[in-house]
Amino acid sequence: MFIAMNRFKVVKGEEKAFEQIWSSRRTRLEEMEGFVSFHLLRGPEREDHTLYASHTMWETKASFLAWTTSQQFRDSHKDAGKNKPLYVGHPEFEGFDSVLEQINTTRDAAAEAAL
């Protein structure tokens, strides 16, 4: 599993605009082999910004790298430069290889038992 994250420092008062950009953007992630899931995360508020992170899970790092060179990536990022006034600084990328995974298998069993 590979996790790709970008951290965004969003100017205070621009949170709704930032979230709207993400909710209305066509990412085409589902077209990519190895794509698992995406989350937009809102973090703590600071004096001049609110921290957000885009969190994308991939089956492999190679799957993620294929995304970054794909037409789908170019299409989904084509208007990114228009949003610079929403940010304090530039987005910061972080990539992580999973070295340990724990899955809650009891949740599914409990749900089935309740049926």
Located regions from the model:
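Short, surface-exposed ligand-recognition loops at beta-strand->loop->(often short) alpha-helix junctions
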Residues: 10-18
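Short secondary-structure boundary micro-motifs
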Residues: 11-12, 23, 28, 39-41, ...
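Coiled-coil-like amphipathic alpha-helices with heptad-repeat character
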Residues: 2, 20-21
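Short, well-ordered beta-strand segments in beta-rich or mixed alpha/beta enzyme
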Residues: 2-9, 39-70
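An amphipathic, aromatic/His-enriched active-site/gating alpha helix that lines ligand/cofactor pockets
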Residues: 20, 26-36, 57-94
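Glycine-rich beta-strand-turn "strand-cap" elements at beta-sheet edges
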Residues: 2, 39-48, 78-115
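A sequence-composition feature that detects small, non-aromatic residues
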Residues: 4, 17, 53, 62, ...
